[in-house]
């Protein structure tokens, strides 16, 4: 699922609309017995909402992690992102 429109949404109304489109796409993928992955534009501030969607099996977040790693180191950048994703996934 391409999450770019969600990531680039301006304002709460547009973000909610794009989030709901992602939720619907994940549901349709699940109904078709597809393995659903999601990503594009996800970063430390917006990943938790997407990661909390039941049915997503993998997130693609590379750019944000590498950008953060420039300042904090790769291990810390990955650890921080993993903590955010795990926290959100626990709410599923």
Residue ranges and their predicted role:
Residues 1-10, 55-74:
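Glycine-rich phosphate-binding active-site loops on the catalytic face of alpha/beta enzymes
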Residues 1-28:
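Histidine/lysine/aspartate-rich catalytic loop segments that bind and position anionic ligands
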Residues 11, 15, 68-91:
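C-terminal helical cap(s) of enzyme catalytic domains, especially alpha/beta-barrels
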Residues 18, 33, 45, 90-92:
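Contiguous, function-dense segments enriched for cysteine-driven chemistry
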Residues 22-27, 47, 75-82:
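Generic structural signal for well-ordered alpha-helices
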Residues 30-35, 55-57:
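Short, well-ordered coil/turn segments that N-cap beta-strands
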Residues 38, 42-56:
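Catalytic cores of alpha/beta
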Residues 50, 62, 81:
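Conserved, mostly hydrophobic/aromatic
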């Amino acid at each position: 699922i391409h999450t770019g429109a969600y990531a680039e949404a301006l304002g709460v109304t547009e973000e909610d609309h794009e989030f709901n489109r992602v939720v619907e796409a994940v549901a349709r993928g699940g109904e078709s017995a597809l393995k659903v992955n999601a990503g594009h534009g996800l970063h430390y501030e917006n990943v938790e909402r997407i990661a909390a969607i039941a049915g997503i099996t993998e997130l693609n977040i590379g750019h944000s992690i590498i950008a953060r790693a420039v300042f904090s180191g790769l291990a810390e950048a990955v650890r921080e992102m993993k903590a955010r994703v795990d926290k959100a996934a626990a709410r599923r």
